[in-house]
């Protein structure tokens, strides 16, 4: 298999602390660049775990359509500003940040007090503007998750009336683009391809880490396929019929026929079912009269055997 290299050819950090990384992957066999690009993009955009604000409690407010005295932004604007926060929480449980401030003040993300397990990526993100003589008290809930989680309106009745739920966007990768270029090869050789990927994150993770995590998820997805073996199913043997389990003694054969069959290791009807008429004649001291006697005894219980052995 053709070995390829991965080079990060560009890395930029924007004013909002989002990061953009451009990676060059190649050379690849024809068609592999599309397969690799689509697979990585799918996992990067929807499969990585991230952190997001899931709920906000504002003192004195119990619904999102209210206004707060002395605050320029209404509640919906504050919720939207909190939803857009880029946050990285290392705690698998819910983290709660708190804000208690007096005006005049322009509240920014850095003013929210979290535990040491929560990092606010863009601390300059505005939250609200408070006028003199007024205050604002907030409680912000942060969780970890994957993908997009809309508010479940059915469960809102079980939550506190003043806890305002937010549609949570846990995706740390904001955008992924890729292009495919053909590389020059020697005359007569199969064409090669190069994959250029641009990964934009919200800053809570780097493009390098995002690519690595996506690749590891794909490895875990495909790893079981590498050990697939075809197990031949052994057909279950059908259970013998009640007639087949009848012992030889119950057929009421003559002493001569009975003794000959016993010497041939025939002990039940199931053993006889493996014989043909020709096979019976080959038993030592077993003539046609004895063979006919066995055939008649089997027919009385509804069993017949072939005249001649089946040729293989």
From Swiss-Prot:
Record's keyword annotation contains Transferase: yes
Keyword terms, alphabetized: DNA-directed RNA polymerase, Nucleotidyltransferase, Transcription, Transferase
Pfam families on file: RNA_pol_A_bac, RNA_pol_A_CTD, RNA_pol_L
GO cellular component: cytoplasm; DNA-directed RNA polymerase complex
Known EC number: 2.7.7.6
Region (Alpha N-terminal domain (alpha-NTD)): 1-229
GO terms of molecular function: DNA binding; DNA-directed RNA polymerase activity; protein dimerization activity
Taxonomic superkingdom: Bacteria
Catalytic reaction equation(s): RNA(n) + a ribonucleoside 5'-triphosphate = RNA(n+1) + diphosphate
Listed InterPro entries: DNA-dir_RNA_pol_insert, DNA-dir_RNA_pol_RpoA/D/Rpb3, DNA-dir_RpoA, RBP11-like, RNAP_asu_C, RNApol_insert_sf
Positions of the UniProt region annotated as Alpha C-terminal domain (alpha-CTD): 246-312
EC top class, as a word: transferase
Cited SUPFAM superfamilies: C-terminal domain of RNA polymerase alpha subunit, Insert subdomain of RNA polymerase alpha subunit, RBP11-like subunits of RNA polymerase
Biological process, per Gene Ontology: DNA-templated transcription
Assembly behavior: In cyanobacteria the RNAP catalytic core is composed of 2 alpha, 1 beta, 1 beta', 1 gamma and 1 omega subunit. When a sigma factor is associated with the core the holoenzyme is formed, which can initiate transcription.
Family, as annotated: Belongs to the RNA polymerase alpha chain family.
Function: DNA-dependent RNA polymerase catalyzes the transcription of DNA into RNA using the four ribonucleoside triphosphates as substrates.
Domain notes: The N-terminal domain is essential for RNAP assembly and basal transcription, whereas the C-terminal domain is involved in interaction with transcriptional regulators and with upstream promoter elements.
Protein name: DNA-directed RNA polymerase subunit alpha
Origin species: Prochlorococcus marinus subsp. pastoris (strain CCMP1986 / NIES-2087 / MED4)
